[in-house]
Amino acid sequence: HYKQGAEKSVKRELLNIEGGKIKKGNNVIFDDLSLELFQGEITGIVFDDILEQKLFIDMLLGDVLLYSGKIFVNEERKAYEEAARLLKQQVAVIGSKSKLLPSITIEDNIFLFSDRKLFLDQKEYRERFQKLRTELNISDDMPHKVRNLSAKEKVIIELLKAYEERKKIVILDEITSLLSEKDLGEVFSLI
């Protein structure tokens, strides 16, 4: 919060977990999880093992509920079930295995399931994709079909899809194993 006359520099909190506990069966995996994610910030998280990482991502996707603790989504305290529902709508995961459909166009992958329309409008999709490319300074030399994209291009298209779907939290899950240092730099400059 700010004083009158001072510049407004309040960060918008997307997610806050205080004293969170996550269990797998009878085993407590996270005993005192605390996390704050803010709009416009990039946060790196390192895990001790793959089970922790998977449960954490599943929790952010709304597939695993906190066992105890407090959770705030968009600066409002929520019950665990409500938080999970909101997180399902607001979180995207981009990982080493692409979720893009290889047999359809890039444009269809970006807009088809994010649109609320009942019918495809490929002309509109092409125009919207071109606008996104221009707006975000993305190269025009990508192949038309997803199956012909490089790993970097797939990550970029998945980022565009998350952007178009207005996802508030985007998780990049182990993309460093997919991309060269140069490609990783290009992806992070887009972000």
Predicted regions and their residues:
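A short, proline-enriched helix->beta-strand linker immediately N-terminal to the Walker B motif
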Residues: 162-168
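Catalytic Walker B motif of ABC-type/P-loop ATPase nucleotide-binding domains
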Residues: 170-174
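Conserved ABC transporter NBD signature motif
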Residues: 69-78, 85-89
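ABC-type ATPase nucleotide-binding domains, specifically the catalytic core motifs of the NBD
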Residues: 108-123
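Conserved catalytic motifs of ABC-family nucleotide-binding domains
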Residues: 51, 98-110, 177-179
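Conserved ABC nucleotide-binding domain
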Residues: 132-151
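Helix-to-loop junction immediately C-terminal to a conserved catalytic motif
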Residues: 61
